């Protein structure tokens, strides 16, 4: 049964009375919804079909929030949470819901948003592509853990942020992390607690790449030589690449730091670093990235998502394909690789972060993709007059949560025949879909992507074609 976080009672406030409510549905954040005195009440960890005892925690004019006290009548879709930290840690929020029910909820939420903005009463079943779903556990290849140094007892906590709080929940393992990463959390916690410069440690970022396990430890000051030796010994024993990152963002491999006198250690150039990488296109392409670069955290779903995007675009001889918000080349590399045997096919990747553009160019060079070029640009600006842009036959968009509304205003001048839109926020996808529909495009495929099982987060991808 799910474990519910019990806050300490505020003695200066009189607690509101307990209510017994019937939950009718989930909201887009995965909270149960009920009605009380004409208001919608949002109840985290409550499920549709359940009768629950709750206590109101916040009341607004048109809605209220409540804390779940007891489940009086349980939903058959309720599941036992697999993580001992569930209900305290702020990472997962749907472990109490069976996996198939999670996916059904996400599909329904996506469809409702698309219907709302499209003006269509329903999503055409012929448009509904199969969802891309993930294994329920151990799917995350990347995570950032926070640290907290207690100046009173000189102790250090390592963990994730608590639910709706900046407090840190110390953890020993995490069932949604790739197993090598989960297994590192407790050893890292013990190691960092022993260091002399605990007060100078920031967050810890863990990455499981195809070429090994990487850890980046943020430091605010140069560490003493004894700490460097302890970190280097740990990296060697665990068989990981352990990097330190200073205030400037510079990275240093602890194995290449020569211990100096008491003041610290000597730093080497970033060019000496081994960078994490992952394969695309059934191993035909390798994508390298630096810690801090954005990459999709679910490796298995990313592979299938990229393959589906390439298939949907249906590349042809002589076409020019634009990949906007391209990052380090996640889609561009696969598109260019598929197009190597198509005479005259060209892929152009555009990204707003200069460091990622440089890494993308390195990736194109490493993979010998002569039909691929990358450019740095302000993605909110009109790029239609850029000399390097030219004719665009097909378009791939993979924007951040804010979506691609500004870009779509000038992209209509290019009139690409097909548009694949990959979204980490269905609300902005639905909004931008209405723009594409108004420009003469038709929605041909819509796929829900369950990139983050056990959480409310929904990703999606859609294919639009210009009406003929």
From Swiss-Prot:
Biological process (GO), any one: rRNA base methylation
InterPro entries listed in its UniProt record: 23S_rRNA_MeTrfase_RlmD, MeTrfase_TrmA_AS, MeTrfase_TrmA_CS, NA-bd_OB-fold, SAM-dependent_MTases_sf, TRAM_dom, U5_MeTrfase_fam
Active site: 424
Catalytic activity, reaction form: uridine(1939) in 23S rRNA + S-adenosyl-L-methionine = 5-methyluridine(1939) in 23S rRNA + S-adenosyl-L-homocysteine + H(+)
Keyword flag Iron: yes
One Pfam family matching this protein: tRNA_U5-meth_tr
EC number: 2.1.1.190
UniProt keyword annotation of Electron transport present: no
Keywords: 4Fe-4S, Iron, Iron-sulfur, Metal-binding, Methyltransferase, rRNA processing, S-adenosyl-L-methionine, Transferase
Residues bound to S-adenosyl-L-methionine: 296, 325, 330, 351, 378, 398
Record-annotated TRAM domain positions: 12-70
Binding-site positions, [4Fe-4S] cluster: 83, 89, 92, 174
Stored NCBIfam families: PRK13168.1, rumA
Function statement: Catalyzes the formation of 5-methyl-uridine at position 1939 (m5U1939) in 23S rRNA.
Protein name: 23S rRNA (uracil(1939)-C(5))-methyltransferase RlmD
